Amino acid sequence: MIRQPFHLVEYSPWPLTSSIGAFTLAIGLASWFHNHGFLCLTLAAFLIIVSMIQWWRDVVREGTYMGHHTSLVTTGLRWGMILFITSEVMFFLAFFWAFFHSSLSPTPEIGCSWPPTGIHPLNPFSVPLLNTAVLLASGVTVTWAHHSLMSGKRIDATQALILTVCLGAYFTFLQAGEYMAAPFSIADSVYGTTFFVATGFHGLHVLIGSSFLAICLARTWSHHFSAGHHFGFEAAAWYWHFVDVVWICLYLCIYWWGS
């Protein structure tokens, strides 16, 4: 019989495979920027996706079917998620720092102006504004889902999560179309680099958050969550609100002020 409230995690290959996949992904991405290494990038992405699916499956099994996620374990998971989001905030602070460092004191190499000479920025009141409305609406629907879960309304929570995932997919579709129609590329001065790195990294977070919420949707449909025990969903909702806040900052700083 277990006489302590903590979950003693068993051996798992997924941290190792995820690390290998992330390392290979970085190498493949750098190679892809130089017009080769796409196969390496694809294999690394496949390894990461498989590792995520298997790791997520293990966590769901341990928490839902084996009962390892006690109140103390859940508290640890909460702090872990808070620290993870804090580390993500530091990522985006670095991108904003690079953007403002370049825009507030433009160098002669880019014409001593911002946007740089020859760069035609995107209209902040077209697709970017629509993307903002889409993400804000998704923040409302994920909050609706959370309150429905706490009230024991599983059907309402399921409907709200379906809307949230659809809005996340629509945002990704709009962002991809914006990238294809952009009159500049990632190689067009520091403006193009900071724009595509910052917004692209946010787009990656939208994909991850949409996957997170899709898993929560499947778990909600399968009766995995109760009114008092649904931290898996809470973590996804925290992450999604973080994605919303970052996008508002990106819109105001890069799309609106930066143009």
UniProtKB/Swiss-Prot annotation:
Keyword Membrane among UniProt keywords: yes
InterPro entries hit by this protein: Cyt_c/ubiquinol_Oxase_su3 (IPR024791), Cyt_c_oxase_su3_dom (IPR033945), Cyt_c_oxidase-like_su3 (IPR000298), Cyt_c_oxidase_su3-like_sf (IPR035973), Cyt_c_oxidase_su3_a-hlx (IPR013833)
GO cellular component terms given for this protein: mitochondrial inner membrane
Compartments reported by the entry: Mitochondrion inner membrane
UniProt keyword list: Membrane, Mitochondrion, Mitochondrion inner membrane, Translocase, Transmembrane, Transmembrane helix
Catalytic reaction annotation: 4 Fe(II)-[cytochrome c] + O2 + 8 H(+)(in) = 4 Fe(III)-[cytochrome c] + 2 H2O + 4 H(+)(out)
Listed EC numbers: 7.1.1.9
Class of the enzyme per the UniProt entry, highest EC level: translocase
Membrane topology: Multi-pass membrane protein
Residue ranges of the TM segments: 13-33, 36-56, 80-100, 125-145, 160-180, 195-215, 237-257
Oligomeric form and interacting partners: Component of the cytochrome c oxidase (complex IV, CIV), a multisubunit enzyme composed of a catalytic core of 3 subunits and several supernumerary subunits. The complex exists as a monomer or a dimer and forms supercomplexes (SCs) in the inner mitochondrial membrane with ubiquinol-cytochrome c oxidoreductase (cytochrome b-c1 complex, complex III, CIII).
Role summary: Component of the cytochrome c oxidase, the last enzyme in the mitochondrial electron transport chain which drives oxidative phosphorylation. The respiratory chain contains 3 multisubunit complexes succinate dehydrogenase (complex II, CII), ubiquinol-cytochrome c oxidoreductase (cytochrome b-c1 complex, complex III, CIII) and cytochrome c oxidase (complex IV, CIV), that cooperate to transfer electrons derived from NADH and succinate to molecular oxygen, creating an electrochemical gradient over the inner membrane that drives transmembrane transport and the ATP synthase.
Similarity comment: family membership: Belongs to the cytochrome c oxidase subunit 3 family.
Name this polypeptide is given: Cytochrome c oxidase subunit 3
